[in-house]
Regions:
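Short, well-ordered beta-strand elements within core beta-sheets of diverse protein domains
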Residues: 68-72, 93-95
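Short beta-strand to alpha-helix junction loop
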Residues: 74-75, 99-103
């Protein structure tokens, strides 16, 4: 932050500070291989690369551009101030196109090779969470969404970004989506710890299915031990169960020994982390939320859904599972005019998908455990 003040950086971009952000990747190239940037024509983000291959258009779709920490969140344009401060060549930044609009047509080469007529290509939300958000099955204006997969993203949808001292302190990000709406959200490690733990047990010769793991977790003692899923030791691949035991020992908690105890510890900790993020969101927006709309692969875990309802003290609406795919399709249909609005898209998805409802249970026990959980946060 010698190049640009951290507070100013956040005030402009409204993005959560994460090592993997595009701004820091490009800054690394500025420091080590600037000649590559000087020679480059345009920076094309990964989702936009597919559009380029299909159409030949070098554009940046708004939602994925908004995650780079190089976009002015209020203007919806590349920030000259940030780009200049980091020493990144301006010429590499392509034109930004709105989410859910036509970006071009298939190239002649593709049409000839595949025997296709000219087909329009739509700029769907390149940031998968923004596609998933389109499929949240609600008509409410104010709602909490939880897109749950390897990563979990918990937040709300706003007309304008929230960028102030409180949101900066909580490291909450503002990301763009369809209709220039803002997703005000926290990035949280999601099912990664479960997935990596399972891979470790497979390496040890125990090929448990996810259903088996859930059954074992249900039989384990409740609310005994917690981890901070976002602690740095849980990010690298490897022996997550051992790291969980070490974390619990270090923080003076009962050490989960069995497979079921480890899985229960992870699920309980995720649910508590969701509550923690939800409280920060509520504090920043000044709004209350009666339902958490949970979408994505994590909704297949009835245990995690129920724990989330218990921890957050509110109803959880779980589904659709394939939220990103459905949102992607809906955005294409909105771009073509076949669906007239995001409200219509959400209603169609709500009527066509299996949505399960979970009500909170054991409130006193979870509230008491939450106070213990907050003490072990990194």
């Amino acid at each position: 932050f010698k190049l640009i003040d951290k507070e100013k950086f956040y005030q402009i971009t409204g993005n959560q500070f994460m090592d993997l952000n595009t701004a820091f990747q490009l800054l690394s190239l500025v420091k080590t291989r600037k000649e590559l940037l000087e020679k480059a024509d345009k920076m094309i983000l990964m989702p936009d690369l597919f559009n380029y291959f299909l159409t030949g258009e070098k554009k940046a779709e708004y939602s994925i551009a908004s995650t780079t920490q190089l976009l002015d969140a209020k203007k919806g344009e590349w920030s000259d101030e940030v780009i200049e401060a980091l020493g990144i060549p301006k010429h590499i930044f392509p034109e930004i196109v709105p989410t859910g609009t036509k970006i071009g047509t298939l190239t002649d080469e593709i049409c000839t090779e595949l025997g296709l007529d000219k087909i329009d290509v739509m700029a769907v939300a390149g940031h998968d969470t923004q596609s998933a958000l389109v499929s949240v099955p609600t008509s409410e204006e104010d709602f909490i969404f939880l897109s749950c997969g390897t990563w979990s993203l918990l937040g709300t949808e706003l007309a304008e970004p929230i960028i102030n001292e409180k949101s900066e302190h909580y490291n909450i990000t503002n990301e763009g989506g369809y209709g220039r709406k803002i997703s005000f959200l926290k990035n949280i490690i999601g099912l990664w710890c479960i997935q990596e733990s399972r891979r470790q047990w497979i390496r040890e010769g125990n090929e448990y299915g996810f259903g088996e793991l859930e059954i074992m977790a249900k039989e384990a003692p409740a609310l005994q031990s917690f981890i901070d899923p976002d602690a740095p030791e849980f990010t690298p691949a490897g022996d997550i169960p051992t790291r969980i035991r070490e974390f619990c020992k270090k923080t003076g908690q009962p050490v989960p020994e069995t497979v079921g105890e480890v899985v229960r510890c992870i699920n309980q900790s995720l649910a508590m982390k969701y509550r923690h993020a939800m409280e920060e969101i509520k504090e920043c927006t000044g709004k209350d939320y009666k339902t958490v709309y949970m979408v994505g692969g994590g909704t297949q875990s009835a245990l995690l859904c129920q724990f989330t309802a218990n921890a957050c003290g509110c109803r959880v609406s779980a589904g659709p599972i394939e939220a990103t795919v459905l949102g992607n399709i809906a955005l294409q249909l909105m771009a073509s005019g076949d669906i007239k609005s995001i409200e219509e898209a959400r209603e169609i998805i709500k009527r066509s998908q299996d949505i399960k409802i979970y009500e909170p249970q054991d409130k006193e026990a979870w509230d008491e455990a939450y106070e213990r959980f907050k003490k072990i946060l990194v």
